[in-house]
Amino acid sequence: MMMMSSLGGGGGGGGGSGGGIGGGGGGRFMTYSSSLSVPPSAPQSPNYSGGLRSQSSVFVEQEKYLSELLAERHKLTPFLPVLPHAFRLLNQEILRVTTLLENATVLSQSGLDHPSPLASGGIFQNARADMNGWASQFPSERSVPSSPGPNWLNSPGSSSGLIAKRTIRVDIPVDNYPNFNFVGRLLGPRGNSLKRVEASTDCRVLIRGRGSIKDPIKEEMMRGKPGYEHLNEPLHILVEAELPIEIVDARLMQAREILDDLLTPMEETHDMYKKQQLRELALLNGTLREEGSPMSGSVSPYNSLGMKRAKTREG
């Protein structure tokens, strides 16, 4: 259902944000480079002395740099009409860094080269700080445009200047799969999976309805309060876009396609996407053990993390 106004509760009512497939061009998946480098302008680690740093250290540093880029983009957004080239260059740098981050979580695992539904241009976007009960170290920000293909960001003169604000609803099939943790799969480690959906589509993604707050007791307390009317509805997703009228519908449909993929349950033994999420969590926590590493402990992060599901989010 397409609407011309934003839906969902106000305030800190709880949508997590995220990012995914890049827009424009050909297929939905892209080939990765396995390199992970620190951008020249990224802050350097205080204990960096020219030697090689651990992968987790570089990963955290990249995330910090990306968070700063996202904050700058948020401040620059009102000036898009007068600074289109600066805006485009900033988005290209965001794309470059986020692609490196996605590459690190996907290809550095020995023998794993299975693109996830979010693999094409996999982008880390900023999430709302609370993530409805999910831990997040990123500030609350708006979405990030997708890859620098032939779209409105690269063609400032191609837009009519008309901005449309629209929202679609995607139902989550909890009745068909009552034991499947859809919210955990959508959010991913520290909300990164959902950040990528937002980042690649330039849409805002909100998880709403019963079960969208991590703490059931808190959900009951918030039910019926202003801004939390959605808690009386079945679990669902709202996808909001405020974009040039020429691309808004395409971006919404792109986001819906990604979410439909993520909402399709799979057998755990064949779920490469979940394995990527588990490995990413281990990398973020500094507990990753690469195959052949002299360090003690489990070789596979999937066997040692005990992360089954990321449950629901808090308002």
Swiss-Prot record:
Which portions of the chain have biased composition (kind: Polar residues)?
31-53, 136-146
Any one GO MF term held by the record is:
RNA binding
Q: Where is the composition biased (Gly residues)?
A: 7-28
Q: Does the keyword Cell wall biogenesis/degradation apply?
A: no
Phosphoserine PTM sites in chain numbering:
S300
SUPFAM superfamilies from the xrefs?
Eukaryotic type KH-domain (KH-domain type I)
Which residue ranges does the record assign to the KH domain?
A: 171-238
Is Amino-acid biosynthesis among the key words of this record?
Answer: no
Q: Which UniProt keywords apply?
A: Nucleus, Phosphoprotein, RNA-binding
Pfam name, any one: STAR_dimer
Put simply, this protein is called KH domain-containing protein At5g56140
